[in-house]
Amino acid sequence: TMDLIKMGCSNILGEIELLIIQFEDNGYHWGLDSQRPQGEIAVINTCGFIEDAKQESIDTILEFVQRKQEGRLKKLYVMGCLSQRYQKELEKEIPEVDKFYGKFNYKQLLGELGKADGPSCDGHRHLTTPRHYAYVKIAEGCDRHCAYCAIPIITGKHVSRPKAEILQEVRDRV
């Protein structure tokens, strides 16, 4: 069993939904309840934009490190925006984490779990929202480098998804 922990914005929710479908397709059972984690593997998808969200992500990682040290968790993986931006620092400061992945490393995580031959991220998602709405990502990144914003540092240049892919995802949801 695997615990998937979502930190931060709704953008992360879409990423978690992609992970869930891949885990299901590869035979993993999962849970999203960070208040009652029960899995032997934990994947924490972090936020790295706002100071409070960064701290919450770090606190959550440390809580799961404690579970691992107590023998209640076998493997701990961290991914998402925080680890994309601060991977080297996190690896140095929290060596108990088995592996830090960036924001775009879904296939590498599956490979680490022994499922390298698993499906690709084709946009098919396991929806965790109520049936009447879903988040649809239309782009990633930003080309502006505002002094107060870390989006371009973390996610790179603005890249739009192909229009046909977006429309197909919306059709699949209706």
Across the structure, where does each feature detected by a protein language model lie?
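Proteins enriched for Cys/Gly/acidic motifs involved in redox and nucleic-acid/cofactor modification
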Residues: 1-174
